[in-house]
C-alpha cells in the first residue's frame, strides 16, 4: 500500500517548494513523485476536498511576496489552481470552512487574521482582515 505525503521545503533557489513523496508501506521505501518549485517559501499546508491549500512565507528582499496557494490533487500530482499574493504578509495557520466557501488565514507574529472567498477550490478574493492589538497578562511576552 502506498501513502502520499506533501512536504514543504525552505531550501535555497530551486530546492524550495513542495515535494510530493510516496511511501511504499511494504518495502518502507520513499519515492519522489513531483517537486514544484515555488517563488516563496511554502509553509503551512492543509488538504480539504482534494485540494491542497498552502501559506507562503515571503522570500523577497523587497517584501512583496508571501500569500496563499491552491492546488488540485489529481492522483499523485498537484495541479496549480491559483496563487494569491499578499504583498509581504505571511500566514502561519490556515483553516477551511465546513461548507468549503471560505479560507481563513492567521499570523500570530503580528496578530492578524484574514478571510478569503473560495470558488470551486480557487482563492477568489480577500473579504476581510483584522489586526489584534490587545494586551495579555504577562507584559514580558509578545503582546499580539
Which residues are covered by each model-predicted region?
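An edge-strand/N-cap motif at the start of beta-rich repeat modules
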Residues: 1-13, 17-22
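Conserved positions at the start
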Residues: 40-42, 90-91
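Residue-level detector of Asp-centered blade-edge/turn motifs that repeat once per structural unit
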Residues: 1, 47-50, 96-100
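A short loop-to-beta-strand structural motif that recurs across blades of beta-propeller domains
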Residues: 17-19, 66-69, 112-114
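Short glycine/acidic-enriched loop and turn motifs that connect beta-strands
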Residues: 11-14, 58-62, 109-112
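Short loop/turn segments that connect beta-strands within beta-propeller blades
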Residues: 24-26, 73-76, 118-121
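Residue position within the beta-strands of beta-propeller blades
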Residues: 7, 53-55, 105
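Asp-box/WD-like beta-propeller blade repeats and closely related beta-sheet repeat scaffolds
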Residues: 78-144
Amino acid at each position: 500500500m502506498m501513502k502520499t505525503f506533501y512536504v514543504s521545503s525552505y531550501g535555497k533557489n530551486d530546492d524550495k517548494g513542495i515535494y510530493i513523496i510516496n511511501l511504499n508501506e511494504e518495502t518502507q521505501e520513499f519515492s519522489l513523485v513531483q517537486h514544484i518549485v515555488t517563488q516563496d517559501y511554502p509553509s503551512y499546508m492543509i488538504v480539504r476536498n482534494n485540494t491542497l491549500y498552502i501559506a507562503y512565507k515571503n522570500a523577497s528582499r523587497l517584501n512583496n511576496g508571501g500569500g496563499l496557494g491552491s492546488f488540485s490533487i489529481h492522483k499523485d500530482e498537484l495541479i496549480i489552481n491559483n496563487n494569491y499574493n499578499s504583498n509581504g504578509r505571511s500566514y502561519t495557520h490556515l483553516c477551511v470552512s465546513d461548507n468549503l466557501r471560505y479560507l481563513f488565514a492567521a499570523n500570530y507574529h503580528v496578530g492578524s487574521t484574514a478571510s478569503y472567498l473560495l470558488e470551486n477550490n480557487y482563492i477568489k478574493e480577500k473579504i476581510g482582515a483584522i489586526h489584534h492589538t490587545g494586551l495579555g497578562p504577562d507584559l514580558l511576552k509578545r503582546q499580539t
